[in-house]
Amino acid sequence: QGRLDLNEFEDLFKELNNEEEKQQIDLPEEFISLCNKDLPMDTTDAFRYLSSRGIGRREILKWKIGYCKEGRYAGRIIIPSFDMEGDCNYFIARSFVGHQRRYLNPPANRDIVFNELMIDWDEPVVLVEGVFDAIAAGGNAIPILGSTLRERSRLFQAIAMHDTPVYMALDG
């Protein structure tokens, strides 16, 4: 238990190298980037929420954070994830107006490497549970989008393939 069976090592990377399984999704049509200089006046609540989480202009630009004021994701901060080619492969939608349901994420597979485009695999990575934890950790932090990392997950496979040192900073 807790050990990798080296007899199955070759199979470990099959999913990672399978281009058919590449996930690409669109951001909501109503997405408004908070990176823009000319923003609507009603962005105050979104900025106030991000500020309360310790997220400033630099993080907003780095993580390409936006929000929706209308539609299915209305009243939610949107934090997109980009794969190595720069395509959006997932996003987190977190309420900033007090919805009963804090997160309303897209109906897509969460087995991704969140924002792999920003990861330096030659440096140690810090695994955290959520995207806000990753933003707060800075540097080379990766959210596992939960509290479990499975051996067959794309993130585990990428870490093993790159032989990257890992630090874990999970909620406890």
Task: Enumerate the language-model features and the residues they cover.
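Structural motif
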Residues: 169-172
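Non-catalytic accessory segments of DNA primases and related replication-initiation nucleases
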Residues: 1-58, 62, 67, 72-76, ...
